[in-house]
């Protein structure tokens, strides 16, 4: 659920940037480049949780995974997506590594939220939103997305068959079995 900057290039296209850090927000503190933000689902505010990389080298003993606001100690619930409070959508260019010399990037639609930083307004999204965009999950916001498992779109079961020789039906069946096992074991699934 960490926030990632979405940056506009000179040609007008958008690309994922780096994580939104404490330094971006103008905070002058030790290891500020490694204190990353999430959206707290309870308040809608952006906060730094315990356990970021900076805490590993900190003296404050907050190198843990408790869902707490690092600054206040208040309990937080990191929001997976900016979908519910998005200020818009943009199409991002994502690197494509699928053996196609003609196609080097994938264009995907992405929900974004505007955040005021020390250097002005920037667009952010979550790692989760980027993952969904990369895998062409159709969220009804446009872009190149897969309408079904049978679409020959990068990362779908139909697409992978030409690279692996594994039938799409088998991939779908296996994925459903893993998901079913995860439900039955409360997430204690190994692949």
Please provide the spans of the model-predicted regions.
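Gly/His-enriched, cation/cofactor- and phosphate-binding structural elements
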Residues: 90, 190-191
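Long, well-ordered, tryptophan-enriched scaffold segments
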Residues: 1-185
């Amino acid at each position: 659920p960490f926030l990632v900057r979405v940056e506009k290039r000179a040609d007008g296209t958008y690309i994922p940037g780096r994580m939104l850090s404490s330094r971006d927000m103008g905070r002058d503190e030790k290891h500020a480049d490694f204190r990353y933000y999430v959206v707290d689902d309870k308040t809608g505010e952006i906060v730094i949780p315990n356990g970021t990389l900076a805490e590993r080298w900190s003296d404050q003993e907050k190198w843990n995974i408790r869902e707490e606001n690092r600054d206040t100690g208040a309990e937080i619930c990191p929001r997976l997506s900016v979908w519910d409070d998005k200020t818009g959508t943009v199409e991002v260019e994502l690197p494509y590594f699928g053996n196609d010399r003609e196609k080097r990037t994938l264009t995907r639609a992405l929900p974004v939220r505007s955040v005021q930083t020390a250097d002005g307004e920037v667009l952010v999204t979550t790692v989760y939103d980027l993952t969904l965009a990369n895998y062409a999950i159709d969220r009804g916001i446009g872009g190149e997305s897969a309408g079904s498992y049978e679409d020959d779109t990068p990362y779908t079961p139909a697409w992978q068959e030409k690279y692996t020789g594994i039938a799409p039906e088998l991939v779908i069946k296996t994925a459903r079995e893993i998901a079913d096992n995860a439900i039955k074991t409360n997430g204690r699934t190994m692949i």
